[in-house]
UniProtKB/Swiss-Prot annotation:
The keyword Cell division does not apply. It comes from Pseudomonas aeruginosa (strain ATCC 15692 / DSM 22644 / CIP 104116 / JCM 14847 / LMG 12228 / 1C / PRS 101 / PAO1). Part of the 30S ribosomal subunit. Forms a tight complex with proteins S10 and S14. One of its GO terms (biological process) is translation. It comes from the Bacteria. Pfam families: KH_2 (PF07650), Ribosomal_S3_C (PF00189). Belongs to the universal ribosomal protein uS3 family. Binds the lower part of the 30S subunit head. Binds mRNA in the 70S ribosome, positioning it for translation. This is Small ribosomal subunit protein uS3.
């Protein structure tokens, strides 16, 4: 079952939180949901170069609070806050209610599944060999302290005539364990040969009693002296 279901969806309410938090009656529910989708599309298009991982939307009492999780907050904020103020005005006009924008910086982008997937996809678009791109991302995540990581790419890899799937894994990725904090994301690389899909699973540890295991960077192994 853990292999089939969406890793984030099955963990909602256990170790994951919803990205949209609001209440609506039957009449307004579809409108709110569609508005959230449009806001996310707008922000992802507007902030393509800002390494945005996640966008949380809260709607408390006739207002909206949008939290943008990004590895490059300076690009979102802009010079003297001009860019974020322009974003706030555009979103207020689009949503029809006053909007407050919070910027959350991602300290370790190597442990964020969406940012890893974006990085691998960008390398594939620059014609980097897919095995090299996957291996580099896996090594960076494990070095920072991930318990396990799996990366899968699917499509016409290397310009092959027949599409295929390749994956690379290191460490543990226990999809059946519901208390396991597994970050999952997908992204698309648009190459001259077609679209290549990228999937990333990152296991950060188990959440027990509301507390997560502390991630510790892995110290590099000491080099062995060559025998003379």
């Amino acid at each position: 079952m853990g292999q089939k279901v969406h890793p984030n969806g099955i963990r909602l309410g256990i170790v994951k939180e919803h990205t949209s938090v609001w209440y609506a009656d039957r009449k307004n529910y579809a409108d709110y949901l569609f508005a959230d989708l449009k806001v996310r599309e707008y922000l992802q298009d507007k902030l393509k170069s800002a390494s945005v991982s996640r966008i949380d939307i809260h709607r408390p009492a006739q207002t909206a609070r949008i939290t943008i999780h990004t590895a490059r907050p300076g690009i979102v904020i802009g010079k003297k806050g001009e860019d974020v103020e322009k974003l706030r005005q555009d979103l207020t006009k689009q949503m029809g209610v006053p909007v407050h924008i919070n910027i959350e910086e991602i300290r370790k982008p190597e442990l964020d599944a969406m940012l890893v997937a974006q990085s691998v996809a960008q390398q594939l678009e620059r014609r980097v060999m897919f095995r090299r791109a996957m291996k580099r991302a896996v090594q960076n995540a494990m070095r920072i302290g991930a318990k396990g990581i799996k990366i899968q790419v699917s499509g016409r890899l290397g310009g092959a005539e027949i599409a295929r799937t390749e994956w690379y894994r290191e460490g543990r990725v226990p999809l059946h364990t519901l208390r396991a904090d597994i970050d999952y994301a997908t992204y698309e690389a648009h190459t001259t040969y077609g679209v290549i899909g990228v999937k990333v699973w990152i296991f950060k540890g188990e959440v027990i009693g509301g507390r997560q295991e502390e991630l510790k960077p892995v110290a590099p192994a000491p080099r062995k002296k060559a025998a003379r």
